[in-house]
Amino acid sequence: MSHVDDGFRSLTLKRFPQTDDVNPLLAWEAADEYLLQQLDETEIRGPVLILNDTFGALSCALAEHSPYSIGDSYLSELGTRENLRHNGIAESSVTFLDSTADYPQAPGVVLIKVPKTLALLEQQLRALRKVVTAQTRIIAGAKARDIHTSTLELFEKVLGPTTTTLAWKKARLINCTFSHPQLANAPQTLSWKLEDTGWTIHNHANVFSRTGLDIGARFFMQHLPENLDGEIVDLGCGNGVIGLSLLAKNPQANVVFVDESPMAVDSSRLNVETNLPEAFERCEFMINNALSGVEPFRFNAVFCNPPFHQKHALTDNIAWEMFHHARRCLKINGELYIVANRHLDYFHKLKKIFGNCATIATNNKFVILKAVKQGRRR
């Protein structure tokens, strides 16, 4: 938990999920402060749009202006809602939209936290292009090291004249004025053929490894089990290639695709519809924080390629939460399979949670692990 006085409100903010006290990560950064410094409250006219507000620092500070918080992270929405409540601000003060929704027309102010993925930034700028005016104040912010020439060129190409500020506390801002430059249309998804399957994989802008099959998933797919039945989960599904493979290999099983990214879940749904339409009735698609709120003892197996970062921050908190949720939701003798970089040492984490762990396969970079939910552990 951390405190910030941004000139609009004095706030107490925390990350979601919370990090441990030994290695705490802040719920806000200098770019948030820098963005807010640019705004004199008397200047704010028309709707306020906030894009990629990681844990609600901007939304909480500007809550009296009833902002729209737009992004592709359910975790960020949960974190923002928690911080609104913690600071005594009504959750209804902020309207949450995902990035593929229609944005409000003629906003007065647009604040953008530059996302890690350039493709997501382009999708969001193209959506803004449809609603902003020459009078809209457009300001983006990030760590100085994360603003590149390609970032500035993208703003210039999609929206119009772009300048950048001097660095302040290692943060930098981008100012942009909309001038309606000519711009070719772009496809909604990026698609590629998945070798040895005949499948075409469709990827929305914020999907992990959207330009091709990542090597961890490739290794995982080579070792997926067959002859499973009941309900199984592709946890952190991304574009759904693991779940697709499980559907094909296990015709008696139903697959639940789960991710905190609406774009990932939409990509998974599209990929089942276009590649295995006959299996669609065996699927469920869920935008969620891991398996929060899912009943215990439901699933026969969970498959997971866990992230080890949240936005720009390296953390194993999300993976740790996924493992605990998986154990709670597995039936007795249900199995968790994960693929991970070898250096992350998830073997000992799984053994601590499940009381057991076995190595299924390994290569020079990745390891596939299996843990079984045993009845003697609660």
Swiss-Prot record:
Superkingdom of the source species: Bacteria
HAMAP family on file: 23SrRNA_methyltr_G
Family, similarity comment: Belongs to the methyltransferase superfamily. RlmG family.
Transferase listed as a keyword: yes
A Pfam family this chain is assigned to: MTS
Subcellular location as annotated: Cytoplasm
Role of this protein: Specifically methylates the guanine in position 1835 (m2G1835) of 23S rRNA.
Claim: Amino-acid biosynthesis is one of the keywords in the record: no
Phylogenetic placement of the source organism: Bacteria, Pseudomonadati, Pseudomonadota, Gammaproteobacteria, Enterobacterales
Keywords of the record: Cytoplasm, Methyltransferase, rRNA processing, S-adenosyl-L-methionine, Transferase
Record SUPFAM superfamilies: S-adenosyl-L-methionine-dependent methyltransferases (SSF53335)
Class of enzymatic activity (EC top level): transferase
Reactions catalysed according to its record: guanosine(1835) in 23S rRNA + S-adenosyl-L-methionine = N(2)-methylguanosine(1835) in 23S rRNA + S-adenosyl-L-homocysteine + H(+)
InterPro entries: DNA_methylase_N6_adenine_CS (IPR002052), rRNA_m2G-MeTrfase_RlmG (IPR017237), RsmC/RlmG (IPR046977), SAM-dependent_MTases_sf (IPR029063), Small_mtfrase_dom (IPR007848)
Known EC number: 2.1.1.174
Name used for this protein in its record: Ribosomal RNA large subunit methyltransferase G
GO-annotated cellular components: cytoplasm
